[in-house]
C-alpha cells in the first residue's frame, strides 16, 4: 500500500505540494481547512516611498500581486522574502528584485536590517 498524505493547506498550496509528493510516490488527499482571501478594498498607500516590502508567505505574495495589478505594475520594487518558497512565488508573479532570507522570520529581520 502506498503512503497517503492528508494536505490541509489552502487548495493552491496543497495542489503544488501534491505534485511534489506524487513525484516521490506519495498519494495525497487534498482537504483544505482554511481559505486565504485578500481583504476587499485593501490599498498600499505610499508604496513609491518604501525601500522594500517584507513578505512572509506565498499567500502574501499573491495578495500583493493582486493589489498591484498585472505586471509590470510595481514589479521593480525590492521584496525580501522569508524563504525560498515565498521568493519563488514572487518571481512567478513577475517581481524582479527578490531576495530570500533563508526560512524564518528572525533571518528575514536580520536581512532587512542589513539591507535597509
Where are these regions (language model features)?
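Signature of uroporphyrinogen-III synthase
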Residues: 1-116
